[in-house]
Amino acid sequence: MLRKTFFIIAMCLVGLSAWSMGVGNKVRVGVFQGNGGAQTCIWETIASIQLDPDMTVQTITTGDIANGVLKDLDAIIIPGGEGATQYMNLGEENMERIRNFIRSGKGAVGICAGAYLFTDTPGYACMHINGGKAIDIEHDNRGHGISAFSLTAEGKKLFPELAKRDKSYVMYYEGPVLVKSDSIPLPYTTMAIWKPMCMKRVMPQLT
């Protein structure tokens, strides 16, 4: 029973202080569109960002990152898909550019496979940047369905529109389950705690 397992709602949230922009400025977001990214996830991510009038969005490729597009962005999103393929497509030089982007105070969000990519997970192709590690990776095909989560005190600051709810709901689809890494001394803040519900093929180890 992993009752203290922490779930990041399929997202890793890194360096979000950069998202507090001045009045009149829009948050400029780049969504990675490279090998391994699921096109549906890319489309849905873009559509979600377009709902917010205070944000602009564009897709970016490995070539764009190599050519300096990050200097014109405030945040990047790595979508779901195949994390190992995205890792290879980015390459070490571009991953270091992303690390420097985050070190400078900019924002980065990983969705599903993108969340795996940001972790410090032993034996997995990842960037070691967010202080968390994925567990139970041998059961990657663990299930999907509507799942509940509750926000921590820090999570309520980040998502004030959900702060009064004891439970909120999200469509979960085989994303990572994260705990604090024990191998790198990076800050790690839990924003939400997963509350497993009935899902197709859900693994009992995580309930």
Question: Which positions does each model-derived feature cover?
Answer:
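Class I SAM-dependent methyltransferase SAM-binding "motif I" and its flanking Rossmann-like core
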Residues: 119-169
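Hydrophobic h-region of N-terminal signal peptides that target proteins for export
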Residues: 11-19
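Cleaved targeting-peptide boundary
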Residues: 21-26
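Helical hinge/lid and interdomain linker segments adjacent to catalytic or ligand-binding clefts
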Residues: 37-122
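Positively charged n-region of N-terminal signal peptides that target proteins for export
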Residues: 1-5
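Catalytic beta-strand/loop cores that center a nucleophilic Ser/Cys/Thr
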Residues: 147-207
